[in-house]
Regions:
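Short loop/turn segments that flank or connect secondary-structure elements
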Residues: 1-208
Length: 208
């Protein structure tokens, strides 16, 4: 571990983990947000180039769970688009074609619906890819952790803070669930058991 500009940095191999991953509390409160992270913001979910082939290959399996407007977006744009920061992200439904679903929080959102959304009977937003039993993008599974590819090689993991996830940070604090604990399974899947064990050890050290 070392002290970086923004606090303690945990280094595990070629992965730099910010302190907030192991010190902040988080537990998704779906009953409150109802999947708002999939329909808010101005960009789709980050994608790794290695995920594109799977998105295309599995499309026949999960497309039936998508909305008609979502399928239209994929037909028009393909399985990804490039955002204003030149990052590869999931395609978005055109704003004029997006419908407002759910309660007042969703209705007042800056609407940028992911093409891979599926909506339940009560207007709640789910992932069509996951609904079909396929693997959704890693950035979705790892949220609120965001991955940055470093110029010199390696990765950096940071916690992304977003107003719509305030209930999740509050729920995590109530239930004493840390970010890395909430994301144990996706972190292990993405980086391996040895990585997660090292991260847990670092967390215990920081918490004294």
């Amino acid at each position: 571990m070392g002290k970086g500009k923004f606090g303690t940095i945990v280094q595990i191999g070629d992965i730099l983990v910010s302190e907030d991953v192991v010190t902040e509390y988080f537990a998704c409160d779906y009953a409150v947000c109802r999947g708002a992270c999939c329909i808010e913001g101005d960009s789709g979910a980050p994608l790794d180039e290695t995920e594109l082939e799977g998105l295309e290959r599995n499309y026949p399996a999960y497309s039936a769970w998508m909305t008609e407007r979502g399928r239209a977006a994929v037909e028009a744009k393909g399985f990804f688009e490039v955002d204003r920061e030149n990052d590869i992200v999931t395609p978005l439904v055109s704003p004029e074609k997006s419908e407002i679903s759910g309660g007042p929080d969703l209705a007042t959102a800056q609407r940028c619906e992911c093409a891979f959304c599926h909506f339940g009977e009560q207007g709640e937003c789910l992932c069509a890819i996951e609904k079909a039993g396929c693997t959704k993008p890693a950035s979705c599974s790892l949220y609120p952790i965001r991955i940055t590819h470093l110029t010199g090689g390696g990765l950096a993991l940071n916690v992304h803070h977003w107003d719509i996830c305030k209930p999740a940070f509050e729920k995590g604090a109530r239930e004493r669930i840390l970010v890395y604990q909430f994301l144990k399974n996706p972190l292990t899947k993405a980086f391996g058991e040895d990585f997660y064990e090292a991260l847990s050890a670092a967390a215990k050290h920081l918490h004294g």
